Amino acid sequence: MDPLVRIKRAILAGRYAFSEKARLEMEADGLIELDVAESIVNAVAIYKRLRSRSSRPTVRREYLYVIYGSTLAGLMVYSKGKFVRENGEEVYYFLVSSKKAR
């Protein structure tokens, strides 16, 4: 299944969480969780997929997805996140970074 579809479904189902860094960026830019969720649901494509190494020894590599999308009010938001798996199953989408697009 397309990663953007999987991300949007996780967001719509409320299966997402924010890192402390993402929360600080959101606060600095005056964004709320709904702004970030709207921007992801309204996104038309994934801007970039980054391969990264996980700090967990059981996970060899993971992908970070960079998404630019707009809120219903027209504000462009940048977000970067990854899927978190537990027992081999995608549990939720974890947002590492969320801020106004520059």
Question: Language-model segments: which ranges?
Answer:
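Ribonuclease/tRNase effector modules and their secretory precursors
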Residues: M1-R102
